[in-house]
């Protein structure tokens, strides 16, 4: 029994050290195959993530490092092995992929522990359209919207500090620090540009976001703790909370007196590096939360974050944009008639609801950049597609409209959708006319004036809408929960809106 206990202690002690795994030949193959079988990562075009990974070259590199007995020889050949600007690109790729595989498997093992199992406050959905019903249900009862963009350019030392909170191997963390500071291109968190995406950058981005959201959960737990203390109402709030602050030590040295409020709610939504928090609170406390996030980036992540980058809006007076939609609140008045014995009285009931619209002016500008129309919205021919066959031209326009219609199916103003349909329909006709060196009338005669509406998508969409709206006549919009990716035009629109908000500030 004593021998078994000693062996267990040795195994636990060995699990803390990750540095020797870099020199294990079989670990890379096993870990890489395990990750492929478990996650089934989709291919991303024009990215460094899907380049071929040669394990033969990896073994050669491991053998070379093992043979270097002298430290001076290692220092001489350091730039050849670790420098990304070196002619042989594969050395840096081997180090990057090896670190990513080790870190991924290490955190997968840690995720099964009880510490991470407690992190159940967040719901992660695959469909993007699940965000919009959540906004309609919960943001209606909020007063203010706080939105900002998560900075992606951070110092490598911050990433090392985040990883050191879970990694106990000092030599491995020193190796990470050495590689990150030597090659800053390896630790770029701009994973949304396809040219710079790597497996290591994806892992670092997720660990960075996890640290951010985990801290927010802990802060909101403290708020619920203060709400549960009933004796705080009769006592002085300022002195009582400052006493609790000295007992409960937090990572940020900020006064918690503005946290206490009876009716307080927070709703958090994030996509990529853009997040929105809906706050149900007074104007004073909402401004305090804006200041809190400013100090949060400054003291917790050591990032010089400008206060102007955090936008705070009142929902009742301003609209807010998210994922290509523009949301706002409108009041509807309902007249209720009540018959009494001698009189007939009318009662006006006002009800608030969130409406979602598509910004047609911004969409027309994006369609003009893609050469589907001009800046005024007049359709033009797509000259780059004139070399394709007629069926390929039909399929491309049909696919663009199909994705656009499904994504913006929950908007209130359907006229904007029909305007986009008009632009794509006439652009398709002009492209065919330019290809055959004829006029639009010839295209109408050959394919019919409603050729764009005769596709399989429109027939299927008409059948679904007729059956659905007959069963539910009061519903005027549909959210499709099988949409997994954001529309390309909506993504460009979101970036454009963020740029205009920065210029206005």
UniProtKB/Swiss-Prot annotation:
PANTHER family in the cross-refs: MATURASE K
Cellular localization per UniProt: Plastid, Chloroplast
Entry's Gene Ontology BP terms: mRNA processing; RNA splicing; tRNA processing
Family assignment from sequence similarity: Belongs to the intron maturase 2 family. MatK subfamily.
GO annotations of cellular component type: chloroplast
Function: Usually encoded in the trnK tRNA gene intron. Probably assists in splicing its own and other chloroplast group II introns.
Stated name of the protein: Maturase K
Pfam family, one: Intron_maturas2
GO molecular function annotation: RNA binding
Keywords noted in UniProt: Chloroplast, mRNA processing, Plastid, RNA-binding, tRNA processing
Superkingdom classification of source: Eukaryota
Main location: plastid
UniProt-listed InterPro entries: Domain_X (IPR024937), Maturase_MatK (IPR002866), Maturase_MatK_N (IPR024942)
């Amino acid at each position: 029994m004593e021998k078994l206990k000693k062996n267990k202690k040795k195994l636990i002690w060995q699990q803390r050290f990750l540095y020797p795994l870099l020199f294990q030949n079989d670990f890379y193959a096993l870990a890489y195959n395990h990750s492929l079988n478990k996650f089934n990562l989709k291919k991303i075009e024009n990215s460094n993530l899907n380049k071929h990974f040669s394990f033969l070259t990896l073994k050669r590199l491991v053998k070379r490092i093992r043979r270097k007995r002298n430290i001076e020889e290692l220092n001489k050949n350091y730039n050849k092995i670790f420098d990304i600007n070196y002619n042989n690109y594969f050395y840096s790729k081997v180090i990057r992929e090896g670190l990513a595989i080790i870190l991924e498997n290490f955190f997968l093992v840690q995720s099964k522990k009880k510490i991470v199992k407690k992190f159940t406050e967040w719901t992660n959905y695959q469909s993007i359209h699940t965000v919009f019903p959540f906004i309609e249900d919960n943001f209606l009862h909020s007063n203010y919207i706080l939105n900002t963009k998560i900075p992606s350019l951070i110092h490598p030392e911050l990433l090392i500090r985040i990883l050191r909170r879970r990694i106990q191997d000092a030599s491995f963390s020193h190796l990470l620090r050495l590689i990150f500071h030597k090659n800053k291109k390896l630790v770029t968190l701009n994973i949304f540009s396809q040219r710079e995406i790597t497996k290591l950058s994806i892992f670092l981005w997720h660990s960075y976001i996890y640290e951010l959201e985990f801290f927010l959960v802990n802060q909101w737990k403290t708020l619920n703790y203060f709400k549960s203390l009933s004796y705080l109402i009769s006592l002085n709030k300022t002195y009582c909370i400052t006493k609790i602050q000295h007992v409960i030590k937090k990572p940020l040295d900020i006064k918690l007196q503005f946290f206490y409020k009876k009716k307080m709610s927070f709703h958090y939504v994030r996509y990529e590096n853009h997040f929105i928090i809906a706050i149900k609170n007074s104007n004073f406390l909402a401004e305090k939360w804006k200041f809190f996030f400013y100090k949060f980036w400054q003291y917790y992540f050591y990032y010089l974050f400008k206060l102007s980058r955090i936008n705070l809006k009142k929902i009742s007076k301003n609209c807010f944009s998210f994922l290509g939609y523009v949301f706002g609140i409108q009041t509807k008045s309902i007249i209720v008639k009540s018959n009494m014995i001698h009189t007939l009285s009318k009662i006006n009931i006002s009800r608030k609801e969130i409406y979602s619209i598509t910004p047609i002016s911004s969409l027309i500008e994006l369609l003009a950049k893609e050469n589907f129309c001009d800046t005024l919205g007049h359709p033009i021919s797509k000259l780059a597609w004139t070399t394709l066959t007629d069926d390929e031209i039909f399929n491309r326009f049909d696919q663009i409209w199909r994705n656009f219609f499904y994504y913006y199916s929950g908007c209130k103003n359907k006229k904007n959708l029909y305007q986009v349909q008009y632009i794509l329909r006439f652009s398709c006709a002009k492209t065919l006319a330019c290809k055959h060196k004829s006029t639009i009338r010839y295209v109408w005669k050959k394919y019919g004036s409603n050729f764009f509406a005769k596709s399989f998508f429109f027939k299927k969409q008409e059948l679904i809408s007729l059956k659905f709206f007959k069963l539910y006549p009061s519903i005027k919009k549909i959210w499709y929960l099988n949409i997994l990716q954001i529309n390309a035009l909506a993504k460009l629109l979101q970036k454009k809106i963020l740029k205009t908000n920065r210029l206005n500030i």
